[in-house]
Structure formats: structure tokens, C-alpha cells
Amino acid sequence: FHQLISSQLDVDRMDYLNRDSFFTGVREGFIGADRILKMLDVVDNELVVEQKGIYSIENFLTARRLMYWQVYLHKTCICAETMLIQIIRRAKELIKSGEEVFVTPAFGIFLKESISLYDFKSNPKYIEAFTQMDDTDVWGCIKVWATHPDKLLSNISQMLLNRKLFK
């Protein structure tokens, strides 16, 4: 059953493909997740696909490939992600230098502390904070940072909010 939540064919991947397909309007990403799940079985503690489900699995793999090319690796998406990384880095720098920067509690842990992958995996505090975080934490902070006195932080935040992306 571990393979249902952590594999190349896990329910999270099926969910985000359908969700991302819906919200971006890219129909090629839509998959029949219900049908795929009905076609799965467990044999000798391994997840297997019934013969009649092979076509649905092929569609899933094709949909993932198409979504990568049309959405995830699209120049606009990559640019917005780069800007988001710069915003977070700048906020982290300001916090580290003692500057007052608004941040939600869950997001703040990751901006105020230097956390290695080992720390993240071994300390339940970080996993708990991560699971408490969602898009609202990030976007809420960016909206507040858009009026921050630091021009770099505020300008890039405003640009991302207004979808004026780097060229």
C-alpha cells in the first residue's frame, strides 16, 4: 500500500495532474484517476495493474509528460518560480540581518532557521510546521511584503502579485 502514496503512480500525482489541468485549462493533463484506482490490485505485497487498466496507465504517463512541457516547464511558470525564490531569499536575508519582516508562524520557522534536509527529516517540529503551511501562508506574506520598506523585497513582491514577470 506504500506505493499508493509514494511511487510513480501515486494518488498525489493523480490528484495534482487533474487539479493543475483544471486550473490551467490544459485538457491534456486530465486523467481518469477513479478508473486507474479501480484497476489496481495488490499481489505478493506489490501494487499491480489489471490488464484492462494498461491503457489508463499509458494515458496517465502521457498526461504527465504533456503537463511538464505545457505547464510546469513553461517559461512563464519558470519565471514566476524564479521570482518566488528571490522573494523568499530576500525575506530570509532581511530576517537574518534583524530587519522586521512579517511572516506566518509555520512559514517563519523556515525563514528564521537554517534547516538541513537531515534536520527536516529528523525533527518532528519541522515536519509539523511544513504540514501546517499552505499557499495562503506564502501569498499572505508576499502581499504584506509588497509594502515593505525594503525596495527589493517590495518591488519583486509587487511584480509577482501583479504578474509583471521578469523578461
Could you tell me what each predicted segment is?
Residues 1-167:
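Histidine-centered, transition-metal-coordinating active-site segments
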